Structure formats: structure tokens, C-alpha cells
Regions:
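Hydrophobic/aromatic beta-strand patches that form the interior of the parallel beta-sheet core
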Residues: 1, 149-151, 168, 185
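Alpha-helical substrate-recognition element adjacent to the catalytic core
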Residues: 1-25
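Active-site metal-binding loops of divalent metal-dependent hydrolases
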Residues: 5, 152-154
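Short, well-ordered alpha-helix to beta-strand connector turns
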Residues: 5, 84-85, 164, 181
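Conserved active-site and cofactor/substrate-binding residues in soluble primary-metabolism enzymes
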Residues: 25, 129, 188
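Conserved acidic, metal-coordinating active-site core of Asp-based
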Residues: 29, 33, 37-151, 160, ...
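Asp-based, Mg2+/Mn2+-dependent phosphohydrolase catalytic module
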Residues: 163, 168-201
Length: 201
């Protein structure tokens, strides 16, 4: 599962099992807002993180997290002739919450807008989050909802934590995730997932 639930790929066959995309018509509008407010903005193709604005340390982090090469493009709105899985704003933590609210006001009726960390603002297809993706996956696999376990640490994990039979917050999770979780495990750096497997499986 990738792109905050926007795409599910069968690990063995490498085939896409499920995918939801956003309309590319929003990219010029999102890019305009990013440039006017000195924010970073990226979207994705099959192999790269496409940088539509200036590079910043948060864009470099995202490229590292998802193991994709960052590619700066001055005319990304012309290059993207397909509907992408998502776009991502990057912003300094001191202003990210403010911009999240403004972007929600501008695009919230057409797109899902939420922070996944203090410096990432996700732009997703309407109705798409990790919970929706898990619902699709377990229906395909025939797994009851009550038998699911979801582990997360960021704002973008909240819906998934609420949906799962057991919602688990990592020790390093934001407070909002810890408040919703049924159980808190160790951090990402201290085998927190292993602890969950040993306890519940």
C-alpha cells in the first residue's frame, strides 16, 4: 500500500490491485499556491518524485523515504499528462498548519487535504485515505475487519488507526494518533512492529 492508500500493489506479481487518482487539472492551481507562498510541491511518476518548485530539505526527505530520485521540472504541469496518485506540499513546521487550513478551504470540496507530518501537506483524491484502502484490501482477501491491526505514527494514519480492529500507535507517534490508539508500541527505531507481532499474532 502506497501513496497514503492511493495504490495497492501485489508484492509478488507487481501488479496494481487497486488505485485511485486525482484529476491533473488541479496541478496548475496547486502549483500557483505553492509559488505564491514559497512552499515546495511535488508529484510522482513511475520512478521519480517530480519537483515542481525549488528543492528544499523536506523534498529531499520525501525522496529518501520513498526511495525515488527527485527530478526538478520547470513545466511539471505540462509533463504530467496523466492523473497522479497524489501531490505533496512541503512547508516549514512553523507555517504548515496555517497552510493546511487555507488549502483545505480552497480545495477541500474536491480533494482530501491533511498533514502527514509537521512539514508535509498531502493532497489526495476525494475520499481516499489509508482506511479506505485497507477496507478494499481486506475485502479482496476475505479478512474480517476485527482481525486487522494497523500501526502508525502520523496524522495521515488516524483514519487507519480508527478503522482497524486494533489500532496501534508507535512510541514516536504524534499525540493525536496516540490518543486514538488501542495500544502503544515501541518506536520505529526500536522494533515497535516486531513487538506488535509478538503480542497480537
Amino acid at each position: 500500500m502506497s501513496f497514503n492508500g492511493g495504490k495497492i500493489i501485489d508484492w509478488k506479481t507487481k501488479k496494481t490491485v487497486f488505485e485511485q487518482v486525482m484529476d491533473r487539472k488541479y496541478i496548475p492551481q496547486l502549483l500557483r499556491y505553492a509559488r505564491q507562498n514559497n512552499l515546495g510541491l511535488i508529484t510522482y511518476d513511475a520512478e521519480r518524485a517530480l519537483v515542481a518548485t525549488r528543492m528544499d530539505k523536506y523534498i529531499s526527505l520525501e525522496a529518501l523515504y520513498i526511495n525515488r530520485i527527485p527530478a526538478y521540472m520547470t513545466d511539471v504541469e505540462k509533463y504530467v499528462d496523466y492523473n497522479p496518485n497524489k501531490c505533496l506540499f512541503t512547508a516549514d513546521p512553523s507555517v504548515s498548519e496555517y497552510h493546511e487550513k487555507i488549502i483545505q478551504e480552497k480545495f477541500g470540496e474536491q480533494l482530501e487535504i491533511y498533514r502527514s507530518s509537521d512539514y508535509f501537506i498531502e493532497v489526495m483524491p476525494k475520499g481516499m485515505d489509508k482506511a479506505a484502502s485497507i477496507k478494499v484490501l481486506i475485502e479482496k482477501l476475505g479478512i474480517p475487519r476485527e482481525n486487522t491491526i494497523a500501526c502508525g505514527d502520523g496524522f495521515n494514519d488516524l483514519a487507519m488507526i480508527r478503522f482497524a480492529g486494533v489500532g496501534v500507535a508507535m512510541e514516536n507517534a504524534v499525540d493525536a494518533v496516540k490518543a486514538e490508539a488501542d495500544y502503544i508500541t515501541g518506536s520505529n527505531n526500536h522494533d515497535g512492529i516486531v513487538q506488535v507481532i509478538e503480542k497480537f499474532m
